[in-house]
Structure formats: structure tokens, C-alpha cells
Amino acid sequence: MCKNFVIMCMDYRFQSATHSWLKQRGFHGQYDVLSIAGSSLSLLSDTEHRTFILNQIDFARKNHGIERIIIFHHEDCAAMGDISKDTREQIKLHHEKMSQAERVMVNYFPNVKVEKYFISHKMVFYPAGNNIC
């Protein structure tokens, strides 16, 4: 069974690094992927996209037994609009948005664990919850 569900941005600049990062942590072949512009941001505003994402998670939960959702956001994401170019500010804002998305997902899927990571242009992965800002 596949225990993990990855939500990541469709931005080509971060695809390879994200999959490599997952492989290095033993997730190779152990995750379903939803790659969508803005990653989990659509859970916060657009009803149609929110429904799409939640339906994908529900499908994976029912058919693949997922227990964990791993969210990746990245630096300089066009879906975030015009925000600060300062990496630390972006990390803080993205972690806030991912936490909001987590609350939406946990409301629908209370038994699913959620992990959140921000990826910098230097391909450094910053887990949410670490006091780095």
C-alpha cells in the first residue's frame, strides 16, 4: 500500500529536487503525487480547485491507504502573487499558508498526518514548525 500523498507545485524548477528529496528519505515508490499550480494554495480560496484536491486525497485514502500528506511550497511561486523577495519572509508566509491548508485537510480527513516543507531556490527544504525566521 501507498501510505503517502504529495501535494506539490507544477513548477518545473522544483520537480527533480522534490522527487530526489523524497527518494533520499525512503519514500521512493511509496507516494501518490498531485502536482498543481500553487500546490495547496487552492485549498484556501477556489471552491472548484479545493473540491478537486480533496477528491484526489479521498481517492488515494480509500484506494491506496494513505496516512500522510506531504505539502511542498517553493520560493518565488507565481501563484502567491507579488510578495517579498526575501527568502525568510517567503518561508514565513508559505508556512502560514500551508498551516491553513492543513486545517482544511484535517477537517475532512482527521486521521491523516500532514507534513509541510518550503523549498528555496538553493533547493534547501525548510520544514514548517522550525524556528528559522
Task: Give the role of each language-model region.
Residues R68-H74:
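Acidic beta-strand-to-loop metal/phosphate-binding motif
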Residues R25-H28, N63-H64:
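Short glycine/proline-enriched loop/turn "hinge" motifs that connect secondary-structure elements
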Residues Y31-L34:
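Short, contiguous, well-structured surface segments enriched in hydrophobic/aromatic residues
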Residues M1-N4, C9-T18, A37-T51, R61-E67, ...:
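Divalent-metal-activated hydrolytic enzyme cores
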Residues H19-R25:
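Short Gly/aromatic-enriched secondary-structure transition segments
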